Amino acid sequence: MANRIMLNETSSHGAGAIKEIATEAKARAFKKAFVCSDPDLIKFGVTKKVTDILDENGLAYEIYSDIKANPTIENVQHGVEAFKKADADYIVAIGGGSSMDTSKAIGIIIANPEFEDVRSLEGVAPTTKPCVPIIAVPTTAGTAAEVTINYVITDVERKRKFVCVDPHDMPVIAVVDPDMMSSMPKGLTASTGMDALTHAIEGYTTKAAWEMTDMFHIKALEIIGKSLRSAVANEKEGREGMALGQYIAGMGFSNVGLGIAHSMAHTLGAVYDTPHGVACAMMLPIVMEYNADCTGEKYREIARALGVKGVDDMSVEEYRKAAVDAVQKLSVDVGIPTKLEALKEEDLQFLAESAHADACAPGNPKDASVEDLKELFRKLM
């Protein structure tokens, strides 16, 4: 099967990039925006940075704020009805993965109403029409949802998250402005940054990886490795580096998939409401150890990209350990816990079965059974 790369039609990067929103909307003759943003971003004036630009340019909009972390089926259903009432013709998604994922689901269902039950879009979605046009404006440096063909929805009733993979949901325009991320608190910067690191490592080692995506992932690792600590310290250079690094990781993994660190993180988020980036960060070193013997020399390049010295003189065992240790140290340095106190022995079977069924699991470089996944989860206890 041929390899493919799917990206935004247009992406703008750097401080002040949000000014391009008006330019892009006018160029496409958009008439009214459905601004999708969460209540906290509205409360702290982050959303206003974008709506001010729309106001200055005479562009109509309506704000929708029924967004929650780990968006649910109900959030999507409410959003679809709100979009219809707004009489909008495009979406401006402002926020982290939650706003982006909600926006994608809304846009897909509006364009493909036969899939009004979002559960029917799980896995590789069978839609036939492009999503309502989305201008994606990330406010976190991690999910890269602005440049991916994936979104994740929580099924509260069944205590699970499900992944929808659909080329039709790619935002037409991504506006990646580090100034939109400057208000992120330390903990959120750390967790979303570790999500980006997990994207880069899982995308680099997944079964579908190839030369072009390898290029993206290694460059992303180099940038994230030298930027995340300073971003958590709220240094401008670190913020700018993470804004770019997480986007580059998205350019890669969206086209080749991920692995069991993500499938397990999705399950932890659904059952315990663990923040996604925290769950990824806790699982990543554990999963890297499990995958090590199925990754060729890639851990040497991971270690090198993360700043480990002398990797060319290391044995296979040494550079594999060095890569895992570098990831673990970065995670600890930015304040991520290594254990999950909420995890219960009686939950392990359900967690493992859910992770095994997750859409990310087949891409893992090493096959993992339900029993394997139970043992990996147990290492968090």
Residues covered by each model-derived region:
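An N-terminal, well-structured beta->alpha segment
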Residues: 1-64
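Short glycine/serine/threonine-rich phosphate/pyrophosphate-binding segments
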Residues: 18-21, 43-46, 73-76, 98-103, ...
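N-terminal small/polar loop signature for handling phosphorylated ligands or for N-terminal nucleophile
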Residues: 42-115, 229-239
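Glycine/threonine-rich beta-strand-loop-alpha-helix active-site module
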Residues: 74-179
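Carboxylate- and glycine-rich phosphate/diphosphate-binding segment that chelates Mg2+/Mn2+
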Residues: 150-256
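Gly/Pro-rich interdomain helix-loop hinge
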Residues: 271-347
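Short, amphipathic C-terminal "tail helix"
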Residues: 346-381
